[in-house]
Amino acid sequence: SAQALDKLVEDRKREGSKIRKIIIAKLNLIEKLVLKVKKIMPLAIKSHQDKIKAKFNAALIDVDQDRLKQEFLFFVQKGDVEEELDRLVAHTSELRRLLNKSEPVGKKIDFLMQEFNREANTLGSKSISINISKISVDLKVLIDQIREQIQNIE
């Protein structure tokens, strides 16, 4: 009947609204974690630089400053996660945009979550600090939680 169909549509809208709120709360946490990485990155780089210097000193190697700079630049490039952080910010903006659409977006969000996961994995693999590694794991947990929620939307 028309009433039953209207009720079903209304129930689905209400459920969609609840899921949207849950996803937005998770997105807010993702954004906070990204900001946290950006904030601790300079200290992590400095700490990593100090470790490299200490290793050279411990080995009692008389290394010229150019060689030390080359080694340091190599490790900084390996640990540079700015691109991944920028992409995570872009993905959060895109997900917010999709959540505000009235058309079905489940498949698009699912694809976007794969991109989120890729960035979180790269962040973890490039990590030069335990704190950044932990944040990477926290990001993956939040991404998984969002993916679970989108299984319930169209």
Stretches found by the model and what they are:
Residues 1-154:
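N-terminal intrinsically disordered, cationic/polar leader segments
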